Amino acid sequence: MQVTTTVEETRKLVKNWKKEGKTIGLVPTMGFLHEGHASLIRRCHEENDIVVVSDFVNPTQFGPTEDLEAYPRDFKRDSELCESLGADLIFHPEPKEMYHDPHAYVSIDTLSDTLCGKTRPIHFKGVCTVVSKLFNIVAPDRAYFGQKDAQQLAIIRKMVQDLNFDIQIVGCPIIREEDGLAKSSRNTYLSAEERKAALCLSRAVKTGQEAICKGIKAEEVLSKMRAVIEAEPLAKIDYVSMVDALDMQPVESVEKDVLVAMAVYIGKTRLIDNFSYEV
């Protein structure tokens, strides 16, 4: 496995692999890898000749009061995991390598106005910009994203379609702990008490799934989910919403495929979870 830190050396490797006719898969990450990331890397390995993992804490997707400096980092552990999973390259640039003197950004209207975009207004602009850069640097045939970040996945798919990137976007299932908590790098922030409290998210998901399968109206589904979360004293709801699975706009009834998503603060840590329902 190789490690690169510059755009130039990464492009050189990619160019050689392309000359050899090899397919390239990209797994974009912010590092501090867990089993959720590992599942993406395994899938990428199954479907491509070359596996590239980007390990970059992207500053442009963090707001001024968010956890950029506190975000967990452990590149040694990340590289060992990637090597054990058969990755061919980790691209691990410094921020100044990715952003010299930036004036151009990529943003997606409408899809980024709801859910996480409502309370994190610059987040998806930063995500789309860095993912576009990675696509241009690595030129992958396929790129892999987890469905835990369902809004991000929808936005990236739309960006790829609208900007004519010749890349297949592969969404992969949410990976959970044995007790149901969705895997997240931010779980490391939680104290033992908060870790226990965080299970209200997966309980709310289960409650919502059961309710929606019974044909209960959208607002009642959300009300039941909110009640589960509000019963936990350490939890503070950012949002619990039901949106159209394609355009991320709120819906009042379940007449087409929907995404039911939530963001909840457990203490100071913001966690997300979701489920999809297909009509």
Residue ranges of model-derived segments:
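Phosphate/ribose-recognition catalytic cores of enzymes acting on nucleotide-derived substrates
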Residues: 219, 224-279
